[in-house]
């Protein structure tokens, strides 16, 4: 009898070597024997008990068996030449309760017959504990029948019959396994030959019955990656030296191992971080070192109600001998884009892809070919697997996919791998055609977007960049930047080719026709609901602008800073703008030189009411020199304006024009109706008219003009113009009218004492009425229209030669009624019409009226009456 003796000590004392195995078990034993006088044991009975310990393969730590308790009882009967050993072994929840018999037939020298059967009528002989997965339920074998032959002379062990089965009231839980084989020690190396066949059984049962020492790495991979379903057929055969089946043994020859397994309804998870393939039909073929798993069909349920179909799958380990063994898999995926979007949003792909698509807002179908490479190892390192997915998307659409906009495509190509992904093709972004190339590399937080598109007026409105009539035409753009769920602060780099478009005061005073080269580059950043354009650079058509600008979610300007603001060659300006807490935009412009010609012209011609929103504004301009038309300049311009609620609250302007003549403006109240007006005055009206290119042939003149301020409603602006002591030079028609006056010969121009006219300004137009010009040699009446949009003047009236004498009759009430044309028209006059551009109108006269008295002339139509497009101003 012995108690708690280490098997290690027993083996060491007996000088026995178990090779690579280390047995660490505390052993207790008791033996009772009857010995014949000849010293031959007649009866031997006893018990061997092993308490908790381990049996470990020193060369491969994965082959490890924990023994909780083992109890062997034995009884040798020499007369019957029979050894009976009932035993029970408990290991990790598994339990083996059987009875082994060993008989030595007298007629067969050196032969022992081994039989293993059920050892207890109540306890199942083999009970296998559940696996780590919830799908791997435990299993019990209730029938065991093993017959084996040990031939010591031939050094051979043969399993003639090995039947393990379970008969259950549930047909799906019935199973049976048949084993035959031999182990031959006669040669230089032990040689094993075996065959295993199984009936239909659950996959979980096969996994639980798989011995821990057989194909350890493959067993570990199957344990983690395959579950559920049924094994329809299993046949395993081997015939090779025993060393070939060891973990560290030589490669298995091609005819040394054959495995044939067919399953249905199986769940396969090739990569642990991706959803499993369910309802799969698998066929496993292993020949020698080559293992191939074919998948006929299956589905991937990425989220409730969203599935992808899997077909044509192949999982192959070309050589199972290297450790770890390298495997590859390929299969085809078909399904809806919403399911694919849910897959991309899964934990295994979200960080790799970097872009999350809402499955609820995506549409289309996807067909993809997937290739996977992995190392069969346990534990599986994070970098032990890689994949490549080539996908074709059709009828694709996804809301807010790029730049917060909807993306649509009839076809789209996508390539994804464990190193990153790429999406490339022709799409529509919020309805705008574009070409995209979207890429993301492993380890990067966001994807990089390369996009080309042509943005027309409709597209700009859809993108919330409605520029009105300031930009007409389509703009080719190139966009490079980072997009994704973790968008960094790098922003989007945009390059816009402005050559094909017409620009009209996109920036104050910048006018560019179609075809003249210009480009803009900037970096667009979205911060919350605001959009900021940094590193803004505009070049072309004389413009050079550098700075930054920011807009809020309503496309309202928040701030702007342009340290370089040159809209024409030679401009030297800076501009800053910011919106205060009261919502008013504060704009400050400073500089030495500014070419104001385009600004003046476009301001007069503006008709875009949508662009003319009268927002709250504080304007502060200080410019050394403002260049105008016809060589005239404003110098020392200092202008301050404040507007609230669409109404101008304060206005003040000081400057000099001509030969240092002041040109000033402010707000005043008109006495007759107590109405606020904008008031300008200067002693050089001619210089101002030349500066604005309204009429370059006027010289001198003390002028004041009063007009209604602009309003939020774009109401017509009524005003009055008054000029005294001025001259008109270089006007041939006027000089012909006065050529007959005494002393008129050789004069350089025509002098006038005063001019007064009422006008009404509309967007892009002006209507003149009740205009009267008086002078010593000639007078005139003026009425008509000026269309700045079409650059067209259409004025008409009457020249009255010798105004002072000729109009004398008109001032006499009775005589003037019959002979005169009224208190402001002469007895004799010449009707005229001025048409053409404002800066150079063409004046024509009607000589017939020169000989007719005023009463008769009223029945002779002026030239303008015959113009079907002429619309007299409203009086």
For each predicted feature, which ranges?
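A short, well-structured beta->alpha microelement
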Residues: 539-541
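Glycine-/small-residue-rich active-site loops that bind phosphorylated ligands and cofactors
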Residues: 774
């Amino acid at each position: 009898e012995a108690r708690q003796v280490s098997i290690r000590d027993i083996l060491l004392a007996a000088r026995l070597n178990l090779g690579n195995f280390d047995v660490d078990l505390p052993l207790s034993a008791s033996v009772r024997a009857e010995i014949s006088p000849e010293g031959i044991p007649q009866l031997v009975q006893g018990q061997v008990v092993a308490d908790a310990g381990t049996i470990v393969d020193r060369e491969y730590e994965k082959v490890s068996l924990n023994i909780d308790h083992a109890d062997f009882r034995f009884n040798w009967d020499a007369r019957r030449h029979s050894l009976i050993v009932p035993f029970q072994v408990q290991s990790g929840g598994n339990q083996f309760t059987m009875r082994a018999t060993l008989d030595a037939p007298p007629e067969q020298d050196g032969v022992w017959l081994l039989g293993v059967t059920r050892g207890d009528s109540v306890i199942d002989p083999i009970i296998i504990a559940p696996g780590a997965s919830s799908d791997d339920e435990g299993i019990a074998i209730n029938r065991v029948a093993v017959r084996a032959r040990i031939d010591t002379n031939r050094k051979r062990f043969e399993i003639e019959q090995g039947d393990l089965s379970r008969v259950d009231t549930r047909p799906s839980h019935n199973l049976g396994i048949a084993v035959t084989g031999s182990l031959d020690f006669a040669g230089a190396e032990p040689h094993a030959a075996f065959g295993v066949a199984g009936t239909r059984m659950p996959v979980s049962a096969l996994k639980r019955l798989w011995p821990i020492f057989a194909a350890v790495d493959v067993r570990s991979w199957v344990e983690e990656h395959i579950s559920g379903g049924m094994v329809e057929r299993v046949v395993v055969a081997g015939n090779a030296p025993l060393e070939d089946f060891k973990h560290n043994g030589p490669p298995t020859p091609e005819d040394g191992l054959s495995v044939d397994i067919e399953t249905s309804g199986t769940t396969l998870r090739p990569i642990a971080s991706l959803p499993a393939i369910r309802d799969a039909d698998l066929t496993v073929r292993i020949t020698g070192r080559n293992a191939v798993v074919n998948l006929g069909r299956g589905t991937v349920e990425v989220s409730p109600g969203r599935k992808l179909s899997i077909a044509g799958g192949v999982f192959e380990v070309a050589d199972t001998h290297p450790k770890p063994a390298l495997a590859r898999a390929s299969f085809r995926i078909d399904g809806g884009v919403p399911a694919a979007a849910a897959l991309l949003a899964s934990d295994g792909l979200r960080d790799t892809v970097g872009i999350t698509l809402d499955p609820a807002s995506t549409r289309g179908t996807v067909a993809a070919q997937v290739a996977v490479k992995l190392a069969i190892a346990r534990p599986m390192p994070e970098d032990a697997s890689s994949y490549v997915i080539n996908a074709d998307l059709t009828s694709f659409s996804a809301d807010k996919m790029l730049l917060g906009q909807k993306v649509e495509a009839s076809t789209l190509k996508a390539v994804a791998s464990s190193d990153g992904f790429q999406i490339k093709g022709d799409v529509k972004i919020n309805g705008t055609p574009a070409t995209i190339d979207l890429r993301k590399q492993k380890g990067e937080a966001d994807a990089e977007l390369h996009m080309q598109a042509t943005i027309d007026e409709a597209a700009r409105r859809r993108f919330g960049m409605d520029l009105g009539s300031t930009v007409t035409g389509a703009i080719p753009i190139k966009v490079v930047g980072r997009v994704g769920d973790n968008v960094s602060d790098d922003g989007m780099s945009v390059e816009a080719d402005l050559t094909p478009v017409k620009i009209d005061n996109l920036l104050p005073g910048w006018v560019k026709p179609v075809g003249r080269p210009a480009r803009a580059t900037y970096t667009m950043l979205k911060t919350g609901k605001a959009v900021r354009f940094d590193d803004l650079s505009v070049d072309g058509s004389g413009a050079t602008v550098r700075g930054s600008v920011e807009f809020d979610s309503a496309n309202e300007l928040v701030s702007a800073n342009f340290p370089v603001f040159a809209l024409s060659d030679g401009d030297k300006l800076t501009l800053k703008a910011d919106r205060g807490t009261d919502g008013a935009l504060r704009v400050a412009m400073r500089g030495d030189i500014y070419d104001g010609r385009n600004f003046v012209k476009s301001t007069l011609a503006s008709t875009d009411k949508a662009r003319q929103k009268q927002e709250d504004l504080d304007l502060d301009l200080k410019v050394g020199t403002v260049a105008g038309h016809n060589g005239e300049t404003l110098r020392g311009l200092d202008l301050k304006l404040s507007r609230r609620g669409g109404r101008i609250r304060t206005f003040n302007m000081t400057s000099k024009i001509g030969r240092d003549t002041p040109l000033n403006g402010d707000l005043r109240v008109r006495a007759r109706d107590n109405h606020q007006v904008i008031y300008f005055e200067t002693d050089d009206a001619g210089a101002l008219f030349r500066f604005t290119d309204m009429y370059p042939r006027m010289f001198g003149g003390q002028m004041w003009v009063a007009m209604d301020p602009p309003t939020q409603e774009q109401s017509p602006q009524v005003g009055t113009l008054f000029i005294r002591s001025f001259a008109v030079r270089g006007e041939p028609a006027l000089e012909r009218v006065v050529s007959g006056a005494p002393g008129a010969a050789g004069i350089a121009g025509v002098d006038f004492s005063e001019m007064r006219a009422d006008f009404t300004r509309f967007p892009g137009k002006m209507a003149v009425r009740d205009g009267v010009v008086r002078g010593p040699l000639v007078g005139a009446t003026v009425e008509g229209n000026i269309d700045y949009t079409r650059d067209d003047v259409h004025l008409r009236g009457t020249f009255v030669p010798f105004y002072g004498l000729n109009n004398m009759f008109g001032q006499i009430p009775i005589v003037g009624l019959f002979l005169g044309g009224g208190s402001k028209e002469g007895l004799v006059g010449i009707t005229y019409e001025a048409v053409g551009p404002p800066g150079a109108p063409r004046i024509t006269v009607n000589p017939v009226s020169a000989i007719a008295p005023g009463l008769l002339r009223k029945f002779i139509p002026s030239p303008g009456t015959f113009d079907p497009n002429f619309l007299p101003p409203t009086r």
